């Protein structure tokens, strides 16, 4: 059974606290039509529409449905409360407009307050903490008050450098530089920024120059000076890989070095008689490198045929290759060549006294020279080297 709760009805005759309830306890669902049937239900549905009349049975009397009249006091209270709400809304609107106008005035004061960009930036940063209105002011101000970027041309930079050099790099300040330059388009902030970059770049260049100077000093310190603290020794130089050190040719008067039997150039040597006293003799030829060497010939094949740094005339073995008379314009130099007897005597001294150094100009024969000489003499059966 469906039960409908009583609904309160407000009656405004003499008091607003008087209520009347209508009792719907006698109403049941038995008189309602059945809407669940499927089929030809048009007649039943039209017949059942009249069930709404049953809801209002017994409500014809004046005591049940009296005239609804609203008290003037209640109506005044409702109308007064509505007017108050309208006034409150109007007040809020006016307050918001006043606040926006005040914010616009603050933005204008901040934008036109100081001529220096640094103070304006501080004001804007302080205003960021106040809320969204300061951000709007910042965006409007940046669009209106943003200054163009300064183009430091070579001429402008030259004036800046002259002003800095006049004041001193360490003592120069932006205000004094700006006064000396006397350029209307520049501000103190522009000059200060350019001065900081100039000092940083100059410091970097000085550091590089100092490093290069110290490196040169260290490099020259490793090179010893002959005769000063080094016992007259020559400084060591790194050799070129694969090439022997260059030795300047030495000319010892009009004498030739002593050639030893077995050297490849000895059989081909032919003495030359000088035509004058001032004639110079060419250096002995160096043995040609065999074709079997893949690259550069060995170092010992390119050595001169006589020791370097010593004269041919010496106290030891003075009878070998040393003239016994003075040279002059009337006595032209003679191509003195040692005889076979003197050569055999020198070789005999070397064999008998192996602990003594070889005489000047006497060198052991090379392997190639010995093999060439043996082949020239017809010796073909040569034992292998140990």
Curated annotation (Swiss-Prot):
Highest taxon listed in the record's lineage: Eukaryota
Membrane-spanning residues: none
Induction pattern: By light. Repressed by BZR2.
Keyword Transit peptide carried by entry: no
Entry keyword set: DNA-binding, Nucleus, Transcription, Transcription regulation
Tissues in which the protein is found: Expressed in cotyledons and rosette and cauline leaves. Expressed at low levels in roots, shoots, flowers and siliques.
InterPro entries, per database record: GLK1/2-like, Homeodomain-like_sf, Myb_dom, Myb_dom_plants, SANT/Myb
Subunit and interaction comment: Interacts with NAC92.
Miscellaneous field: Plants overexpressing GLK2 have a delay in flowering under long days.
Protein's name according to its UniProt entry: Transcription activator GLK2
The species this protein was found in: Arabidopsis thaliana (Mouse-ear cress)
């Amino acid at each position: 059974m469906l039960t409908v709760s009583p609904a309160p009805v407000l009656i405004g005759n003499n008091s607003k606290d008087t209520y009347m309830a209508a009792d719907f306890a006698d109403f049941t669902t038995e008189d309602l039509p059945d809407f669940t049937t499927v089929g030809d239900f048009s007649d039943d549905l039209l017949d059942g529409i009249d069930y709404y009349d049953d809801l209002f049975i017994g409500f014809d009397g004046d005591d049940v449905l009296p005239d609804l009249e609203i008290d003037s006091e209640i109506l005044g209270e409702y109308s007064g409360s509505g007017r108050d709400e309208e006034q409150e809304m109007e007040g809020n609107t006016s307050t918001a407009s006043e606040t926006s106008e005040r914010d616009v005035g603050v933005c204008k004061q901040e934008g036109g307050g100081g001529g220096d960009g640094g103070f304006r930036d501080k004001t804007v940063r302080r205003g960021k903490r106040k809320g969204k209105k300061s951000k709007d002011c910042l965006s409007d101000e940046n669009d209106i008050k943003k200054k163009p970027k300064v183009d430091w041309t070579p001429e402008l930079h030259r004036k800046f450098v002259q002003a800095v050099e006049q004041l001193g790099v360490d003592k120069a300040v932006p205000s004094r530089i700006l006064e000396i330059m006397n350029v209307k388009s520049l501000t103190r902030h522009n000059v200060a920024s350019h001065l900081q970059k100039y000092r940083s770049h100059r410091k970097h260049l000085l550091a590089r120059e100092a490093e290069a100077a110290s490196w040169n000093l260290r490099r020259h310190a490793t090179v010893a000076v002959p005769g000063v603290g080094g016992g007259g020794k020559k400084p060591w130089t790194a050799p070129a890989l694969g090439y022997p050190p260059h030795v300047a040719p030495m000319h010892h008067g009009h004498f030739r070095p002593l050639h030893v039997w077995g050297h490849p150039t000895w059989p081909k040597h032919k003495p030359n008689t000088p035509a004058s006293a001032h004639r110079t003799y060419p250096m002995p030829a160096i043995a040609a490198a065999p074709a079997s060497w893949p690259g550069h010939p060995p170092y010992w094949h390119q050595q001169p045929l006589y020791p370097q740094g010593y004269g041919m005339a010496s106290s030891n073995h003075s009878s070998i290759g040393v003239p016994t008379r003075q040279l002059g314009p009337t006595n032209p130099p003679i191509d003195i060549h040692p005889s076979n007897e003197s050569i055999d005597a020198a070789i005999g001294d070397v064999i008998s006294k192996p602990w003594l150094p070889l005489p000047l100009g006497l060198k052991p024969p090379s392997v190639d020279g010995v093999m060439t000489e043996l082949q020239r003499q017809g010796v073909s059966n040569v034992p292998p080297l140990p």
